[in-house]
């Protein structure tokens, strides 16, 4: 974030936790941990920046805030997790695994818009195309994920999916993995 972005973040309230649930991100986590004196959380097996310590996010373990639980992918090449917030019928917070990038926005160049459209990025209730290529996930994880009760999804890529996230992602899991 630039200075204006940091000011906007500060205006939202106190940053107490920096949570890394996706292996393909987090290069600036140490900056935010230091700036805010925040607790750093990662999935087991994720690298931790030098000079930073991290608490481990594990299903059934300690979590960054009350009313939160952790889902861990067990059949991927890199660690990845999803947080489930027990509010409003269940809210999933995902990084790269679940995406809801419906259309490209004004920040896409024409070239990237064409490339990413061709790669299958702009799909409602999607599994991240690059994440799929890198991680080669298995259906067993999505069968487990499908068992979670959730109505909404906040994905690291795309718009919030409200009210029908459980049904829409379940249909995607069935289409891609037969579960």
What do these predicted regions represent?
Residues 6-64:
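Active-site HxH/HxHxD metal-binding segment of metal-dependent hydrolases
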Residues 24, 74-75:
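Short, glycine/acidic-rich beta->alpha junctions
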Residues 29-30, 70-72, 80-81:
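Short helix-to-loop capping/linker segments positioned immediately adjacent to catalytic or ligand/cofactor-binding
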Residues 1, 76-177:
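Metallo-beta-lactamase
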Residues 61-63, 175-178:
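Short, structured secondary-structure boundary patches
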Residues 12, 39, 145, 176-179:
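Alpha-helix boundary/capping residues
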Residues 62-73:
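Short Pro/Gly-enriched beta-strand edge/turn motifs at strand-loop
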């Amino acid at each position: 974030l630039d200075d204006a972005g940091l000011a906007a973040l500060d205006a939202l309230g106190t940053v107490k936790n920096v949570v890394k649930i996706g292996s393909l991100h987090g290069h600036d986590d140490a900056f935010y941990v230091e700036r805010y004196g925040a607790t750093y959380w990662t999935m087991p097996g994720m690298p931790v920046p030098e000079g930073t310590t991290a608490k481990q996010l594990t299903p059934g373990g300690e979590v960054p805030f009350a009313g939160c639980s952790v889902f861990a992918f067990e059949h991927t090449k890199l660690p990845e997790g999803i947080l489930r917030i027990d509010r409003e019928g269940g809210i999933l917070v995902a990084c790269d695994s679940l995406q809801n990038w419906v259309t490209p926005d004004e920040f896409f160049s024409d070239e990237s818009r064409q490339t990413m459209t061709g790669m299958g990025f702009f799909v409602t209730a999607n599994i991240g195309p690059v994440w799929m290529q890198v991680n080669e996930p298995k259906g067993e994880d999505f069968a487990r994920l499908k068992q979670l009760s959730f109505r909404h999804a906040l994905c690291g890529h795309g718009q919030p999916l409200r009210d029908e996230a459980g049904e829409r992602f379940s249909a995607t899991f069935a289409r891609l993995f037969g579960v």
